[in-house]
């Protein structure tokens, strides 16, 4: 899509999202928040930011309430963008929600298998991944029933074709389903962004390639010490990314963390994640890299990638706020700045 037609169809949305991005909290705000002695002080500090009085009607504050209210703000922003979207952006935003749908499905299946309360599970589902038949997941007893009764009418149905050979819904099979769904979803989203082309592809393909690589690394590490075979593991790797296909073939044969490090050594940024002298965890490195890639999306104009990037940056901001609030509650303010700053 050329710049003129993009501006005609989506210029307002791009300006709106860039306005949201410019209001993300800066480092000095986090520093001020980390010095708060109570959550009341925390509320007061946030009142001078774009969050304004979003906690004004909360008589009792907890980190969970702060997270929930901040997420409500994000949902309102996402909904406003979606209401203004043209057909292509609307489909792009649908793809964004599919990841939350998968997460909700896995949350309900895992919780049901472990005997958790259905009502509590449904309350924990992410609103962006809600669909009409979601509550029926709690009574599914096998994968065929899960597909034919609950998911066949959802956008995720095509992703399930490689899951239908699974047996009963035990914890290991649920993990296999999760990773198989994500593989199909990421490959589909990647191809959709390639089809859009132009700056949307330029910004989104590196982001999705990183996500594919992160999943391949995580799947490998989490499979150690389980009954998952190397062949089954390899089938769950997305078929794109900077690690694909050479490094993923090494990951498929990996037997320990050292093998994973060797597989990632050909990609400089990833090899740094395994620096033994670093005090950061692998997840810390992943989160920092994700923020870096999403910030880069705002350096280009006339593309849909900033919608995805803003959502991910706002989610990291919410995690930062929740962490600081929890540190204040637990009287561990010395740990409050163990976050991933954005601006």
UniProtKB/Swiss-Prot annotation:
Protein name in UniProt: V-type proton ATPase subunit d
Example GO BP: vacuolar transport
Encoding gene (name): vma6
GO molecular function, one term: ATP hydrolysis activity
Gene Ontology CC annotations of this record: fungal-type vacuole membrane; vacuolar proton-transporting V-type ATPase complex; vacuolar proton-transporting V-type ATPase, V0 domain
Record InterPro entries: ATPase_csu/dsu_sf, ATPase_V0-cplx_csu/dsu, ATPase_V0-cplx_dsu, V-type_ATPase_csu/dsu, V-type_ATPase_csu/dsu_dom_3
A family per Pfam: vATP-synt_AC39
Subcellular location: Vacuole membrane
Organism field: Schizosaccharomyces pombe (strain 972 / ATCC 24843)
